[in-house]
Amino acid sequence: MIKEIALENFKCYKKLNTIQLAKVNLLAGSNGRGKSSFIQALLLLAQSLDSEKGLNHLEMNGRFVELGTFADVQNSESKGNLTIRYKTDDKDESDILISFSSYENKTQWGEIISFTLSGKELIEEMGSATGENGEQKSHGLGVTSTVAGLSQLYNVYYISADRRGPVDFVKKNDNRDDNQIGIHGEFLINSLAKKGKDFTDKVASELSKILSGATIQVENTDTDYLRFYLDSVNDSKGFRPTNVGFGYSYILPIVMTLMLAEKGAKIFIENPEAHLHPGAQSRLADFLMRKSKERDLQLFIETHSDHIINGLRIAIVDGILEESDARILFFSREGLGDTNVYQIKIDSKGNLSDYPDGFMDEWGIQMSKLV
């Protein structure tokens, strides 16, 4: 598990301030305050580590995020080196600090210039000769790219806020990893087809608990396409998803990912509450917390839903999670200033340690106008 992180000169994060993390982390706050940037920083490291060059260069546009150029993610007021520091809870309790700079003055690249593990520098400097007086230097991790702590960034899943809506059929694709359904859920139907009816029925059962009824069917046709059917009641023949409530298609990638993810995985989810009735949001929260416990998943959930937040509180009251398993991160920012992250804890009775302005207060504000 990643137990803390700090960002410096990454988008709205100017100073290296430490943020404590837990098994389940809810990211809340007004729009444009740094929640998505927080998620992007970790996804950027994960996709870079998984790329051909590893962490020697930042993979700015990859399988998780497309962020443009290195200059696009540098803090606009600083333009200094981009630094990410994180600690893990593995047996070595790795403390990793990584810094990147623009590559040979080319703003589209981010080249690694420092990698320290618990205070020890592991970067190798490699010369790229262009003459005695004009020799340039590049840096690389070399064989040290397998150091402890980096394994925390390999087992990563991401479900974007921009999920694929209702789809009636897709082209067959047998070359995909059936445990990876895509950040938009674009490979979901192929994954269901490969997993078979037993798994599909299990997904339908979980979906039914959240949405009070569900049927899922995949028809393997004689053509190059798979047909997909949904319904809002159990044990039906199903209908085209375009004729069923939008929430079914939008929640399905979340349910499947938590059922397919390897144990110990890091899962990033944006706006799980989208297109869901408040009751369904609460039941989804219960599903998320239970799966986190059962499968030892570390969750990072960006949400604007009080029902998701209260679901985390209830999970602690009901004993599904321990107090130390939960953290609410509330992101705030004034004008062009630094992003401030309030780290809110939950006690055994579900009480919150802090209520910063703008956090779970809109209901009270509206009620005061109605009385």
Mark where each language-model region is:
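Switch/communication elements of ASCE P-loop NTPase nucleotide-binding domains
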Residues: 1-73, 199, 213, 219-371
